[in-house]
Amino acid sequence: MKKFLRVFLIFIGVFFLASCGSKIETKTFVGSPQYGIDSTLTYTYQGDKVLTQTAKNIVSYDKLGITKEEAKTALEPVSKQYEDIKGLDYKLTYEDKQAIEKLTINYEKLDYDKAKKVDGIQIDGDSSKGISMKKSQELVESQGYTEQK
């Protein structure tokens, strides 16, 4: 009975410690609108390791001084570079007054070598250790983003 109780308490202790360290959290950063583009970045992370990052950009045709057709001509080649890269999910939709671009990066599945070649994706340091939430936050805040709480 003592042995069973001891094993049970050890199991509960290990389970408790594992559950404490595995909390998945989210942080969202909003960029100040520049050049007719509203940008929001959302990070999902565990500890200091970023699991996913989602960038949502809303591009106003009027603010850029272009038409919907001109936006398509300019953005279609950009959207092609995201195709066939494991870990990237890219969607671009055109509405009447704006285009909405959404890019989700799953760092657990990402083909880092291919992703590094894409314009706008910046991966510094040793990616085999994962992407640091702390460093990501410092980077986006240095670029004018503010955390949305």
Residue positions per predicted region:
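Positively charged n-region of N-terminal signal peptides that target proteins for export
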Residues: 1-6
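C-terminal motif of bacterial Sec signal peptides marking the signal peptidase cleavage site
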Residues: 16-19
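Subset-of-secretome marker
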Residues: 22-149
